[in-house]
Amino acid sequence: MNNLENIVEQLKRNRVVAYPTEAVFGLGCNPNNESAVRALLKLKKRPEEKGLILIAPTKELLLPYIDENKLTAAHWQIFETPSERAITWVMPAKKAVPQYLTGQFDTIAVRLCCIPAVIDLCERTGFALTSTSCNLTGQEPCRTADEVKLQFGADFPVLEAETAGKTNPPEIRDIFTQHIFRQG
């Protein structure tokens, strides 16, 4: 039995948590709460300029961040078409999206994620999640809840569930050019 309700409560309280994704555990929080995102960046020692990935099981949870006016029906079809591998899409960001999410860019990286844990967390919280690999600087990304506890301590909030078992992290691509920023 996992600890889903506790992790949902932590997210609603704007805390950083660890949860399983396609290949590794991710560190996530409420992207709408600046203090939560800044806590994540500090924990990860990640520069704000890099920006963050947002994931959700539905397009609707990601729409508040995406500038829809710059996308055509063909772009949406590409984004919503299921793929053998997970793909994070770099898309135009709405002007109101804070820099702590976009970094130095006018884009936002988003991914539709159908991992049961992510579906449960997003449905119960009502928001998308930030997603960055769960590891301390210089360490390998965590692939199990036990590895998260070893790196971050026994009391760190981690969802007791499994990743989808993929070997590689999701690919990162530009929605307009299909340019691959990170091979999956």
Curated annotation (Swiss-Prot):
UniProt subcellular location: Cytoplasm
Pfam families: Sua5_yciO_yrdC
Any one GO MF annotation of this record: L-threonylcarbamoyladenylate synthase
UniProt EC number: 2.7.7.87
Any single GO CC term annotated in Swiss-Prot or TrEMBL for this entry: cytoplasm
Reactions that this protein is recorded to catalyse: L-threonine + hydrogencarbonate + ATP = L-threonylcarbamoyladenylate + diphosphate + H2O
Keyword terms, alphabetized: ATP-binding, Cytoplasm, Nucleotide-binding, Nucleotidyltransferase, Transferase, tRNA processing
PROSITE patterns: YRDC
The UniProt record lists the keyword Nucleotidyltransferase: yes
Domain YrdC-like: 1-184
Superkingdom of origin organism: Bacteria
GO BP, sorted A to Z: regulation of translational fidelity; tRNA threonylcarbamoyladenosine modification
InterPro entries: DHBP_synth_RibB-like_a/b_dom, Sua5-like_dom, TC-AMP_synthase, TC-AMP_synthase_SUA5
Similarity comment text for this entry: Belongs to the SUA5 family. TsaC subfamily.
Known function: Required for the formation of a threonylcarbamoyl group on adenosine at position 37 (t(6)A37) in tRNAs that read codons beginning with adenine. Catalyzes the conversion of L-threonine, HCO(3)(-)/CO(2) and ATP to give threonylcarbamoyl-AMP (TC-AMP) as the acyladenylate intermediate, with the release of diphosphate.
UniProt-recorded name of the protein: Threonylcarbamoyl-AMP synthase
Gene that encodes the chain: tsaC
